[in-house]
Amino acid sequence: MDCPDGVADLRFVPLALDCRRRYTLRSVPTNPKPVTLFEVARRAIEISDPANADPRLGELLGQFEDADEPVTAIQNLEERVAIAVEGVDVEIDDPAVSMAAASIFYLARRRDELRADPSAILRLAARAEWKGDPPERVADWLADRGIKV
C-alpha cells in the first residue's frame, strides 16, 4: 500500500497505518488488573496455612470474600482487617491469625511480592508489622516454620 495522497509528513499518519510498510499494528501497553483485598487476603492466608487446616484462618478469609475493590482504593484497611481479625480471634492470641493479618498489610503495600516465596513474605511481614521484634508467640510460630525474623 502506498501512502495516502497528500501525506508528506508521517507524523500525521494514523498509528495503525505506517506508509512505509503494510499495515502495522503497534502494541498498546495495558495496565495490570488491580489487586483486590480478597486476593491479598487469600494469598496471606495461603501463606499462613498452606495445608488449609486452621478453621480460624478459613473464617478470616470468609470475612473478605466480598472484598472485590482494589486494595489501593481502601482508605481504612487497618480498621477492616482489625475488625475481621477480632471476628475470628477475640483475644488476638492466635499467632497464625496475627501473621495472616500482618501479611495482608504487607502484601497490600507490596503487591509486587504477591507471588514471592512464602517464607520471605512471612519474614518481611513480621519485620514490617513488629519492627523486627514480633511477640513471643508469633516468633515461636515462625521458628516452627524455620523462619528467623
Model-inferred region functions:
Residues 2-149:
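Acidic, polar-rich N-terminal leader regions of halophilic archaeal proteins
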